[in-house]
Amino acid sequence: NAAGAILDNTVRYSTVSLGYDIGNGTFRRPQEGKRVNSLDFKTEGGGIYEGLHGMYVWGSFSYSRYKVHKAEYNASLIDPLRGMPFIIADTNRSNWVNQDYNLEMQMTTPLLWNRVIIGITGRYQNAVGAKQLDPRPLVRLSQFTVIPSVIVKFDKHALGLNFDYY
């Protein structure tokens, strides 16, 4: 709940990370590929800003580029393990080159009328994947989410609500 973030009295902070991962072996789900190489970058930061009248502001950005080698049972999906109850399968092993980036932000008002806090979360995800053995090589994924939220304080307790739109 974005509105509840200001209740933690978070200090201002920022982080940056860069990583390279290599995965290899047979202890895996078949759709993940026998070998995976990935490059990841992430930054995030936020806090309470007096210049914005005590609002809490937070944001993050992440970028990932990964190569999947010898993936099985993946017909043409960037994320074959996306929580669906069925699998679109292909018996041919394939290689993939995928990249995605995610943007996320949260903004929260200070306590209004000594009782109410209003917040909003925004998320944007974009991904492009190219199966290296297929006449339809390019697959795209985009998702935009807006989550308004509100907190009502009662002395030492608080009640929060989220409203998801995507």
Regions found by a protein language model. Name each.
Residues 10-16, 53-59, 114-118, 155-161:
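Outer-envelope beta-barrel architecture signal
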Residues 14-22, 59-65, 120-126, 161-165:
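Transmembrane beta-barrel strands of outer-membrane/channel proteins
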